[in-house]
Amino acid sequence: MSAKIQKTDAEWKALLTEKGAEPVAFNVTRHAATERPFTGKYEDNYAEGTYRCICCDAELFDSSTKFDAGCGWPSFSQEVKEGAIEEHVDKAHGMTRTETVCANCGAHLGHVFPDGPTPTGLRYCMNSASLDFKPR
């Protein structure tokens, strides 16, 4: 499935700049870069609210599913609703992982691993730079 929202790199850069996104946000969301562990602004955020895509504002995660995985990136046990996130096989860096992207705009979010808490057993390991937090 292809993203519903499509823009040029210049348009994404302008949008992220206008939103005041972190400088690394463009490379993370549009070129699948990864922010350094323990550096993201949401890694230690446990306020109640919703995490949205920094590029298109689509709801991705509810704070009630966030947990401390000790990995250095914000981790969630499930997406806010089925279909909010798409998964793709990622064979970069000599390993096979499952990449997660925003289903609405294709922004790279991070990866999902099968080592999370019950009931899903999943750990959505996200880049803070790809998220925007909206408190309740």
Swiss-Prot record:
Catalyses which reaction(s): L-methionyl-[protein] + [thioredoxin]-disulfide + H2O = L-methionyl-(R)-S-oxide-[protein] + [thioredoxin]-dithiol
Class of enzymatic activity (EC top level): oxidoreductase
UniProtKB keywords: Metal-binding, Oxidoreductase, Zinc
Cofactor: binding details: Binds 1 zinc ion per subunit. The zinc ion is important for the structural integrity of the protein.
Xref: InterPro entries: Met_Sox_Rdtase_MsrB, Met_Sox_Rdtase_MsrB_dom, Mss4-like_sf
GO biological process: protein repair; response to oxidative stress
Cofactor annotation: Zn(2+)
Domain of life, source organism: Bacteria
This protein's record includes keyword Nucleotide-binding: no
EC number(s) given by UniProt: 1.8.4.12
MsrB domain boundaries: 9-136
Residues annotated as binding Zn(2+): C53, C56, C102, C105
Keyword hit for Metal-binding: yes
Active site feature: C125 (nucleophile)
Molecular function terms, GO-annotated: peptide-methionine (R)-S-oxide reductase activity; zinc ion binding
A Gene Ontology term for the protein's cellular component: cytoplasm
HAMAP family: MsrB
Annotated family: Belongs to the MsrB Met sulfoxide reductase family.
Name of the protein: Peptide methionine sulfoxide reductase MsrB
Species of provenance: Polaromonas naphthalenivorans (strain CJ2)
